A protein has these predicted regions:
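C-terminal-biased regions
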Residues: 1-55, 59-74
Length: 74
């Protein structure tokens, strides 16, 4: 079920021990409560998948969906 409202694109950053992944996601400003944007269930599941693939170092999958940054030792 899609939430009714204005759709906006936002960049979200998913951080793990070895990577930071930047992905663009869609947020919705609901017409019933426009106080703040929210995620639809599909977007929440996508963000979970990004984190899971980052933890597994699945770089091919991650690069197909966003930008991948590697952590370096200080």
């Amino acid at each position: 079920m899609r939430i009714q409202g204005q759709r906006i694109k936002k960049m979200r950053f998913i951080q793990t021990d070895h990577y930071v992944v930047a992905v663009e996601v869609e947020m919705v400003i609901p017409t019933d409560d426009p106080s703040e944007p929210c995620y639809e269930p599909e977007t929440v599941e996508f963000l979970r998948q990004v984190k899971l693939h980052a933890e597994q170092s699945d770089l091919a999958w991650l690069k197909a969906r966003g930008k991948v940054y590697a952590a370096v030792a200080a």
